[in-house]
């Protein structure tokens, strides 16, 4: 945990805008599921791969910093209880003094869903309802909900988030359903591993998803996540393309290890953004 504190403080000192933490409850020696962000479908995880719970990591990072935003990239929402999660999110929002962003997705590993006992086939519908539940709890003084999975009346959920009405909700994933979900349930869309030459058309597709949902595209945020191991010049080309397409932020995934991360942060801070 000391390394996490060091990385967070170094990120803030270099002027990086935000830190994002992934979620996987467990990992597996082998996967039947196809990883959607690699050419061969292999996630490339090591045998001893592991990550802290992202809400815990966000809290630790927030409590040793004062300006940098922290977020989940991404939290696998359908694996969670939404009433419990709503309370946990409020706690992180308070611990960070309103510097928390909630990035969520439906997950890609059926093995992980099997392990935690959550039906894989229902994860999309479960995600939509859970988003409704959490936003109701954060917004209403006395909350009621009727849905196919959860029903409750006369519920008081306090305290409310620092950010009004709640921390920004970023819907993670690719095109199609995640974009439609962002347009109907989210504050923004968080795409992952979009090639430089595909950024403009991807943002145009997000605009169309918003228009189909009768929502002004300008009210839906745009964020891209980029697994990256190239040069600063190559990254600058990507950032320029993202900026032209009105992407608000690019989250750069560079690898693991405290010393390596600090070095990469120093390099990123030198890029003219």
Per-region residue spans from a language model:
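Active-site-adjacent structural elements that line small-molecule/cofactor binding pockets in enzymes
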Residues: 1-273
